[in-house]
C-alpha cells in the first residue's frame, strides 16, 4: 500500500512538472522522477520488489481497457486484416528473426533468445506517443500503430509464455503451441466480448431504472478491467485480449449512452482520462526506478558488452522485419 501511494505521488509530481515544462514529454519526466525516487532512501526503501503479475493486472490491464474504449469498434472491423497482419504475423516473424539472430551470436541459448525476442517485439502505444511527441504522424501509419498496440501486447505475452515453457522443458511442441495460442487468443476475445456485453446490458437496464446511482455505476465501470482480467486468467485464456475487447464494446455503449445520460458519460470520460494519465506516468516511474536499481546492484558487470550486443541485435532485427 505504501509503495502504491509513493508511486502515485511520484506520477502526479511528474505530470505537474510536465505542465510547467510542456516541451518535454511527461513520460521522459516520469523516468527521471523514478530515478530520483530510488536515490532518496526514505522513499526508495519503501518500494516493494517488482512483481510482473501484479503490474500487468493492476496497471497494464486497465490501461489497455481504457485505450480500447477510446477506439471505435467499427474501426477495428475495418482494419481487421491489418490488425491480424501486425499483431500475429508480424510479431511471430519478428520473434523468429530476432530469436535466431540472437542465437547466432552464441551468447544465449535458442530458447532464451526467443524469450528475449518475445519481450522486445510488441509495440507500445504510450512509448509511441512519447517518441512522436511534437511530430506529425501520418494518419494511416498512426492508425495502424494504434490498432497494433491494442492487441500485440497479448500476442507478445502469449508467445513469451510459450518460450518460457520451451526454456523450462527443453523442447517445444509446435502443434500444442499453436493450439494453445488459438485457445488463449480466441478464448480471450470470446470471454471479453460476452462478459462486456452482459455488463453493458445490465448497466443500460440500471440506467433506465429508478435505482440508478452515479457513484455505484462509475465504481463498477472502474473495476471492470480488473475483474475481467483476473477472471479470464483464471479460465486460462488471455486476460489482456479480454480487457481490450471489453474496452471496444464499452466504446459502443458510450456512444449510445451519450443520448441517455450525457452528464454521466462526460464525468466518466474525465475520470478515465485522469486515471489513464496517472497509470501511464506510473509505468515510466517504475521503469526509471528499476533502471537505477539494476545499475546500483551491479547487474551490469563483465558481461555488459554482451547485453549491449543483444540489445543492438534485437533492435536491428525488429527494424528490418518491419521495414
Please report, for each region that a protein language model flagged, where it lies by residue.
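Transmembrane helical cores of multi-pass secondary ion antiporters/exchangers
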Residues: 1-323
Amino acid at each position: 500500500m505504501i509503495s502504491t501511494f509513493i508511486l502515485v505521488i511520484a506520477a502526479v509530481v511528474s505530470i505537474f512538472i510536465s505542465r510547467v515544462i510542456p516541451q518535454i514529454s511527461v513520460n521522459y519526466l516520469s523516468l527521471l522522477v523514478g530515478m530520483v525516487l530510488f536515490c532518496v532512501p526514505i522513499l526508495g526503501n519503501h518500494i516493494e520488489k517488482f512483481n510482473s503479475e501484479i503490474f500487468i493486472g493492476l496497471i497494464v490491464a486497465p490501461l489497455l481497457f481504457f485505450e480500447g474504449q477510446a477506439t471505435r469498434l467499427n474501426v477495428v472491423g475495418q482494419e481487421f486484416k491489418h490488425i491480424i497482419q501486425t499483431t500475429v504475423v508480424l510479431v511471430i516473424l519478428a520473434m523468429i528473426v530476432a530469436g535466431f539472430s540472437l542465437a547466432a551470436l552464441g551468447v544465449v541459448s535458442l530458447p532464451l533468445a526467443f524469450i528475449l525476442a518475445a519481450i522486445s517485439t510488441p509495440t507500445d502505444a504510450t512509448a509511441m506517443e512519447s517518441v512522436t511527441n511534437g511530430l506529425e504522424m501520418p494518419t494511416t501509419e498512426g492508425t495502424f500503430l494504434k490498432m497494433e498496440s491494442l492487441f500485440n501486447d497479448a500476442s507478445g505475452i502469449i508467445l513469451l509464455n510459450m518460450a518460457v515453457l520451451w526454456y523450462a522443458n527443453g523442447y517445444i511442441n509446435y502443434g500444442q503451441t499453436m493450439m494453445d495460442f488459438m485457445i488463449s487468443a480466441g478464448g480471450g476475445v470470446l470471454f471479453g466480448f460476452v462478459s462486456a456485453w452482459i455488463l453493458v446490458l445490465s448497466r443500460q437496464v440500471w440506467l433506465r431504472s429508478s435505482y440508478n446511482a452515479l457513484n455505484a455505476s462509475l465504481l463498477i465501470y472502474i473495476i471492470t478491467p480488473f475483474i475481467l482480467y483476473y477472471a479470464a486468467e483464471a479460465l486460462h485464456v488471455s486476460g489482456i485480449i479480454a480487457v481490450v475487447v471489453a474496452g471496444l464494446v464499452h466504446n459502443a455503449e458510450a456512444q449510445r449512452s451519450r443520448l441517455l445520460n450525457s452528464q454521466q458519460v462526460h464525468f466518466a470520460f474525465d475520470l478515465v482520462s485522469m486515471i489513464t494519465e496517472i497509470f501511464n506516468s506510473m509505468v515510466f516511474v517504475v521503469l526509471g526506478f528499476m533502471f537505477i536499481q539494476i545499475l546500483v546492484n551491479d547487474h551490469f558487470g563483465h558481461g555488459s558488452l554482451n547485453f549491449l550486443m543483444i540489445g543492438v541485435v534485437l533492435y536491428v532485427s525488429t527494424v528490418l522485419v518491419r521495414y
